[in-house]
UniProtKB/Swiss-Prot annotation:
The active site is at 80 (nucleophile). Signal peptide: none annotated. InterPro entries: PsdUridine_synth_cat_dom_sf (IPR020103), PsdUridine_synth_TruD (IPR001656), PsdUridine_synth_TruD_CS (IPR020119), PsdUridine_synth_TruD_insert (IPR011760), TruD_catalytic (IPR042214), TruD_insert_sf (IPR043165), TruD_pseudoU_synthase (IPR050170). Its EC number is 5.4.99.27. This is tRNA pseudouridine synthase D. The keyword tRNA processing applies. It holds the Pfam family TruD. It comes from the Bacteria. Belongs to the pseudouridine synthase TruD family. Transmembrane segments: none annotated. The keyword Lipid metabolism does not apply. GO terms for molecular function: RNA binding; tRNA pseudouridine(13) synthase activity.
């Protein structure tokens, strides 16, 4: 299995180095749910600004303040502790009057707004995230500048970031041990983390192999294509390749790669043979996913950061802004820009 640091680059390995997250203010994330609170209902949506505390900690503190069980406070996604982040929490308070959340006190956390809502906010129920990153001590400004220009046109590999695999790859190692021993895993969180790491690693492997081809965005017979921003896909046939290639070049369609699991992967013929060969050596992880009934799915192979802009504060410091859809990783964008020092694994998804 290829480790994250050794995965194939779309724009070649960066020539320079730089520092990501010298301080929390260098990594700002603003959650985009894609909808507004209903203004009525038994739930309360609470938009918070936090710095130095993780999402679960804030959710538990909010539950205590509202005198409800911790399970009654939900969120769409975990946000990094060591960053400045805005996100929504959702508290279920049936039959209660609207509390004064301006009185909620927690170090490093501020309530920005809150309103009634009809539905629980579930994990993954967000449109995306807006990022503002500051890279410091950049050793090769010209290389980073050209890479930013290239990313605007060609995007970046849609890799799952190192944080998906745990510090030191612990989640993937857990999945491998589980696959090899077949010992039942009772802890639901471990099961979820390990299965997710296994499937994500196989996806990354397929994308890394595809990137080694001369033209990564060349449609081949049997490719599974999806409309940009949509989840469903269809299979490319030889008769349609010219027209489908035009639509891929126009970013109307995206070539996808497999998230292996039980059931059909979605590709056929040449594309299916390529994907199967790319992960042929990982029989244990594939068998684990099938055994645990994790359904196969598809994910876009490339990622195009939206609203990408940047500003050089000086020759060694650049501020970069962009928006990514839910499930994508800012660190996979940074990886194509600079060689960073430190481990990405501590950065929450």
């Amino acid at each position: 299995m290829i480790e994250f640091d050794n995965l194939t680059y779309l724009h070649g390995k960066p020539q320079g180095t730089g520092l990501l997250k010298a301080n929390p203010e260098d990594f700002v994330v603003v959650e985009d749910l894609g909808f507004e609170p209903d203004g009525e209902g038994e739930h309360i949506l609470v938009r918070i600004l936090k710095n130095g505390c993780n999402t679960r900690f804030v959710a538990d503190a909010l539950a205590k303040f509202l005198k409800i069980h911790a399970r009654e406070v939900s969120f769409a996604g975990q946000k990094d502790k060591h960053a400045v982040t805005e996100q929504w929490l959702c508290a279920r308070v049936p039959g209660k009057e609207m509390p004064d959340l301006s009185a909620f006190q927690l170090e490093g956390c501020q309530v920005l707004e809150y309103a009634r809502h009809k539905r629980k906010l579930r994990l993954g129920a967000l449109k995306g995230n807006a990022f503002t990153l500051v890279l410091r001590e950049v050793s090769n400004r010209d290389d980073v500048e050209q890479r930013l220009i290239d990313i605007c046109v060609k995007g970046v590999p849609n890799y799952f970031g190192a944080q998906r695999f745990g510090i030191g790859g612990s989640n993937l190692q857990g999945a491998l041990r589980w696959a090899q021993t077949n010992t039942p895993v009772r802890d639901r969180n471990k099961r979820s983390f390990w299965l997710s790491a296994a499937r994500s690693a196989l996806f990354n492997q397929i994308v890394a192999e595809r990137l080694k081809k001369a033209d990564v965005n060349q449609v081949v017979d049997g490719d599974a294509l999806q409309l940009a921003g949509r989840g469903s896909w269809f299979v490319a046939t030889t008769e349609e390749l010219v027209e489908l290639q035009r639509r891929v070049n126009d970013k109307e369609l995206m070539i996808t790669a497999a998230l292996p699991g039980s059931g059909e992967w979605g590709t056929q013929r040449e594309a299916l043979a390529f994907e199967q060969a790319a992960v042929a050596a990982e029989t244990e992880l594939q068998a684990l996913l099938v055994r645990e009934k994790v359904e196969a799915a598809r994910r876009a192979m490339l990622l195009y950061p939206q609203q990408l802009s940047w500003n050089w504060w000086d020759d060694v410091t650049v501020e970069i802004r962009f928006w990514l859809p839910a499930g994508s990783f800012a660190t996979s964008v940074v990886r194509e820009l600079i060689n960073t020092t430190g481990d990405y694994a501590h950065i929450a998804e």
